[in-house]
Structure formats: C-alpha cells, structure tokens
Amino acid sequence: MKLHYETISPLLKKALEKISKSDLFEDFTLVGGTCLSLQLGHRRSIDIDLFTDIDYGKMNTKLLKSFLQDNFQYHENLESLNDTSMGYSLRVGDNIRETVKIDFFYTDKFIFPAIEIDQIKLADPKEIAAMKIGAITQDIPRQKDFWDIHELSDKYLFQDMVEWGIKRNEWTISENDIIKGFQKIDDILESPEGIDCLKGKYWELIKDDLKELVGDFINNKKR
C-alpha cells in the first residue's frame, strides 16, 4: 500500500518520520485521523496521535522528553512528561509558528495487528473503525469521527464496525449507546477549522447516508 502523504503537511510528515525511525517509539502505534487519512486519502489531517497498549506507568517519558528536545528545535509542554499520566499532549516543530500537535496516550489492548508501511507503524483501518465507533458515543461527538465512519463504510459493513467498536470498548459501550450516538448527528457542531475533504463529499449528504445505514441496521435487528 502507498500512503497518501498529500493528506498531511510537510512538517507533520517530517516529524512522523523522525519518530518512526527511532526504536524508542516501537511500542506506539499511529491512530486517529492522520492514520486513516494516510491509508484512505479521504481528508487532510493535522496532528499525530500515538497510542500504546503497554501497562500503565511503563511509558519511558524521560527518554521521550530527551528525544523530543534533541530532535526538534521548538517544543511545548514537555514538562508534563515529568509526571505519570494517562497521556500527554505536546507540540513540536521548527519554531513557534510551525508546530505539530503530538499526543502520546495509553489505550486499551489493540484488537487488530498493526500495519507497517514506510517504517511507520499504523493501526489497521478496522481498529480505527472500532475507535471511531467508540468516539461517537461520547457526550459531545465530533464531526470528523462521523466523517471518518462514513468513509470506512465504503470499505466495511456497518454491522462489523459496530461489533468491533463493542469488542474494543466492551466494558464501556453497548449497541444502544452506539445507536444513541448516531441519533445525535443533526446536533453535531461542524468543526471550527472545517474538514478539508479530498473526495468532494458534503456534510449534509454524509449525514443522510449515515442515518440510512443506522436505520437499516436497526430494522435488520428487528427481523
């Protein structure tokens, strides 16, 4: 598979390559919108989400901090790495005006093996589907999560994505939670920064498609 580097900025690509080439990050997997955009090429993405399913407290934040200090001229919030936490949101780059947001977070165990392309360890799109399904059950779901689910629905059955979402979040969400999440779609605020779609899709049509998918899913359950 060729990655869609046109979906990310040159600065993000450079940061991702630096990190991916270091053994220090072997326990981390790229997830989120950037991971999906690189594989599907459907929209631009602007940050780096790196998740690890190692045991809590095992992240070597001291070495992470040293690496980021040594490899990036500019950085923000590195002092947060001095404390043990579920995750860290940082910024790195060339200067104060040219930065990339990088998140390092603990996560539940991955349910699909990662994929390695160009030395980048990427979550399987099925894993991202499971994560996105979980994300739309939150109190205030994000527009881009619905957008990504719509793109994934061209590749996978909705029923399968629901099952993966429950498997990955078995203690926290149910099928009913997922349906309720989709029922909020008309109330979702559009992303302030907008969604730079590379496939000519429109939010109103995406909403209609997803409503139909969920409606069919519910009707099939009643049979």
Task: Give the ranges of each region predicted by the language model.
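Compositionally biased terminal segments of proteins
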Residues: 1-223
